[in-house]
Regions:
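Extreme N-terminal basic, low-complexity initiation segments
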Residues: 1-13
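Active-site core segments that coordinate phosphate-bearing ligands/cofactors
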Residues: 59-60, 164-176, 190-202, 206, ...
Length: 477
């Protein structure tokens, strides 16, 4: 077998890596030149001298806080093609006064989607799972300890000050580079410790690692997802033993971290591979953007940031509550913004039967001008999102369109604030913002974002997370 061609893939319009559109001489040159840039996704297709090509299929399982999807990807004549084969709903479940994830139901959906992929495409070379960050499953030996708490649960509220009494947040940020969020893994594990839940626990797996464990039996600890929780050293890219010791957490729970691209096992003949298992980590890998351009991964949360060579943990970043999360060979300097959570909750309360096209049209027609602080804690997990808006506004919205106009304008202004902070903290000006995810399909919000930030918005209505997941699997070969 010889390398017969190297092709450029995959987003319309196709982006070529070389100005003259010529292929690289060999696979090594291709790999050297294609990292860490994501100007284009490049893949090698190996064929015979006669040009016969055997298609290889890969499966990305991408699960968000409100839904999950299974997407098969393959390289067909130089074009990366994808097909969604399964989609399912997700959401928190209230159990004994706490918000939890039905992890067994998620496992069932993961397996069902895999079967759908095999029914349609036959042999699947490999699969990988990505999800949101910070949440985890505790294990006693091979048995899961339930419930699996969801990050919007309030169980950490009472222990934040206690944690910061043992290690000041300024020190925590300096060591780990992670912004303050009351649901960070560091606070959740401390709450478990206080409640006695860690007694006898032998391991904890982040949600995607647990789902892959249920497939192949291998316990893994992937780097990008681990960094979301406020426990990984920004200097060493491993768990910070001093933070762990300061909080009295069991040191044995914190294993060496594994990088994206690692094969951890097999499931019914398919390799199980670690992608960037934090969904934003995979999403950034899937964005075809200019080097060092800001991005917004717009879903339940909006993550706005840039790639940097190393973490930025200075005082300005701490005071502005910026985060440093692991990427595939780079750091993601970014900020969490409340995102489509606001819009989705308003819709579920005010107009669950309306399509988003109709909602956006009503928001555009509205003349309501007040806004809210989209990142206020009042919007994190309210009993009623509409009531939370009412309490924050001096003039009550008079229509459904008013609520949504307020929400969209508030999000755009939060993007503006974040971009201004980014430019101050990095000492650079940026001309464009690349937006992917569900929010990229909202032309009204994109226009508001352009007006608020003064930046060109490049909206890419693509499944960037799944594409990044697939890219990592394919590049492994």
């Amino acid at each position: 077998m010889k390398t017969s061609a190297i092709f450029t893939a995959c987003f319309p319009p196709a982006l070529a890596c070389r100005p003259d559109n010529t292929a690289f001489a060999n696979k090594d040159t291709f790999l050297e030149n294609s990292r860490p840039s994501t100007n284009a996704l490049l893949f090698c297709i190996i064929g015979t001298e006669q040009g016969a090509i055997s298609l290889k299929y890969y499966l990305a399982v991408d699960i968000g806080a409100s839904s999950g999807r299974h997407i098969v990807g393959w390289n067909d004549g130089g074009e990366l093609k994808t097909e969604e084969v399964y989609r399912f709903p997700n959401g928190v479940t209230e159990l004994d006064g706490h918000l939890t994830w039905d992890i067994d139901a998620l496992t069932g959906h993961v397996k069902t989607g895999i079967e759908r992929a095999r029914e349609k495409f036959g042999t699947i070379e490999s699969l990988s799972v990505d999800t949101w960050g910070v949440d985890y499953v505790l294990l006693k030996g091979d048995e899961a300890l339930y419930p699996c708490y969801a990050y919007r649960d309030s169980r950490t509220d009472s222990i934040i000050d206690e944690v910061h009494g043992k290690i000041a947040f300024s020190e925590l940020h300096r060591r780990t580079g992670i912004q303050f969020q009351p649901f960070n893994t560091v606070y959740q594990l401390y709450a478990d410790q206080k409640a006695g839940r860690l007694a006898g626990v032998t391991d904890f797996l982040m949600i995607p690692e647990y789902l892959m464990y249920r497939l192949c039996g291998a316990k893994s600890h992937e780097y990008t997802n681990a960094t979301t929780g406020g426990l990984v050293s920004a200097a060493t890219s491993e768990y910070d033993k001093e933070v762990i010791a300061a909080l009295g957490l069991p040191e044995g729970l914190f294993r060496p971290l594994q990088q994206p691209g690692t094969v951890i096992g097999e499931y019914e003949g398919m390799k199980v591979v670690l992608c960037a298992t934090h969904d934003t980590g995979s999403a950034v890998e899937g964005i075809p953007m200019e080097e060092n351009a800001p991005y917004i991964s717009s879903g339940t949360w909006s993550l706005l940031g840039i790639k940097t060579p190393r973490p930025i943990t200075d005082e300005a970043s701490e005071l502005a509550n910026w985060s440093n999360e692991g990427g595939v060979g780079y750091n993601r300097y970014q900020k969490n913004i409340m995102g489509m959570w606001l819009v989705n909750r308003l819709r579920s309360e005010l107009c669950p039967d309306k399509q988003f096209g109709e909602i956006v049209a009503e928001a555009e027609a509205s003349r309501y001008e007040e806004t809210v602080d989209a990142n206020a804690n009042a919007f994190l997990a309210p009993d009623s999102m509409a009531a939370a808006f009412d309490a924050a506004l001096s003039e009550q919205p008079g229509s459904v369109g008013d609520y949504f106009r307020c929400a969209y304008r508030s999000l755009a202004l939060s993007y503006m604030d974040a971009v201004q902070e980014l430019e101050r903290n990095t000492g650079r000006e940026y001309g464009a913002i690349y937006i992917v995810g569900g929010g990229a399909k909202n032309a009204f919000l994109n226009r508001l974002t352009e007006e608020a930030t003064g930046k060109k918005v490049v909206a890419l209505p693509i499944e960037a997370t799944a594409l990044g997941n697939l890219k990592i699997q394919m590049e492994r070969e």
